[in-house]
């Protein structure tokens, strides 16, 4: 049996950089405003994993009303989510993450993001794809007000 999950997240810029995305610190003049470290890529990926096992979203499991999660490293959240996936008898088939941002430029950091995600999801890097695109200066991402990310995962019953 296979299951598919989709996730989406967005955070606006504010404060000081760097931007933490895909488990990697990307130099930029601003960071992302969030209760956790604001890693939109890992938040979308975590939501996709939770969606695939019909377990809600990260807001349900790690609410921003709980100070326990204030400033938390999103890689720890992702690992916890993947533990839940494995408890349901699934493993990751593949994941595809799309980062939507006018800035900062992501290309130099994509390989490091893939490595971090593959490590945290206990899989081969060939099962992880990360790509970045812009909105051609349209909308809030085009105006450099924030970053959005979408993620899709395929889970395989073990």
From Swiss-Prot:
> Where, in this chain's numbering, is 4-CDP-2-C-methyl-D-erythritol 2-phosphate bound?
9-11, 35-36, 57-59, 62-66, 101-107, 133-136, 140, 143
Name the residues that bind a divalent metal cation.
Answer: 9, 11, 43
Q: Which domain of life is it from?
A: Bacteria
Which InterPro entries does UniProt cross-reference here? Answer: MECDP_synthase (IPR003526), MECDP_synthase_CS (IPR020555), MECDP_synthase_sf (IPR036571)
Name the Pfam families for this protein. Answer: YgbB
User: Which cofactors does this protein require?
Assistant: a divalent metal cation
Cofactor info, note text: Binds 1 divalent metal cation per subunit.
Q: What catalytic activity is recorded? A: 4-CDP-2-C-methyl-D-erythritol 2-phosphate = 2-C-methyl-D-erythritol 2,4-cyclic diphosphate + CMP
- Supply the alphabetized keyword list: Isoprene biosynthesis, Lyase, Metal-binding
What are the protein's GO molecular function terms? Answer: 2-C-methyl-D-erythritol 2,4-cyclodiphosphate synthase activity; metal ion binding
Q: Which GO terms describe its biological process?
A: isopentenyl diphosphate biosynthetic process, methylerythritol 4-phosphate pathway; terpenoid biosynthetic process
Site residues (Transition state stabilizer), renumbered to this chain:
35, 134
Enzyme kind, highest EC tier: lyase
Task: Look up the record and name the pathway of this protein.
Answer: Isoprenoid biosynthesis; isopentenyl diphosphate biosynthesis via DXP pathway; isopentenyl diphosphate from 1-deoxy-D-xylulose 5-phosphate: step 4/6
Name the Enzyme Commission number(s) assigned to this protein. 4.6.1.12
PROSITE patterns attached here?
ISPF (PS01350)
User: Which PANTHER family does the record match to this protein?
Assistant: 2-C-METHYL-D-ERYTHRITOL 2,4-CYCLODIPHOSPHATE SYNTHASE, CHLOROPLASTIC (PTHR43181:SF1)
Q: What does this protein do?
A: Involved in the biosynthesis of isopentenyl diphosphate (IPP) and dimethylallyl diphosphate (DMAPP), two major building blocks of isoprenoid compounds. Catalyzes the conversion of 4-diphosphocytidyl-2-C-methyl-D-erythritol 2-phosphate (CDP-ME2P) to 2-C-methyl-D-erythritol 2,4-cyclodiphosphate (ME-CPP) with a corresponding release of cytidine 5-monophosphate (CMP).
Q: NCBIfam families given for it?
A: ispF
Q: How does it assemble?
A: Homotrimer.
Family, as annotated: Belongs to the IspF family.
Tell me what this protein is called: 2-C-methyl-D-erythritol 2,4-cyclodiphosphate synthase
Can you name the source organism?
Vibrio vulnificus (strain CMCP6)
The gene designation is ispF
């Amino acid at each position: 049996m296979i299951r598919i999950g989709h996730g989406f997240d967005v955070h606006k810029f504010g404060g000081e950089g760097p931007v933490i995305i895909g488990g990697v610190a990307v130099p930029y003049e601003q960071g992302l405003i969030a209760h956790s470290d604001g890693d939109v890529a890992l938040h979308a990926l975590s939501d996709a994993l939770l969606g695939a096992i019909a377990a809600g979203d990260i807001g349900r499991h790690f609410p921003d009303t709980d100070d326990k999660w204030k400033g938390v490293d999103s890689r720890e959240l992702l690992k916890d989510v993947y533990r839940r996936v494995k408890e349901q008898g699934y493993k990751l088939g593949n994941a595809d993450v799309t980062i939507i941002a006018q800035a900062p430029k992501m290309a130099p950091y994509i390989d490091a993001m893939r490595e971090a995600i593959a490590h945290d999801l206990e899989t081969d890097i060939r099962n992880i794809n990360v790509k970045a695109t812009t909105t051609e200066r349209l909308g809030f991402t085009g105006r450099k007000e924030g970053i959005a990310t979408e993620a899709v995962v395929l889970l395989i019953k073990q």
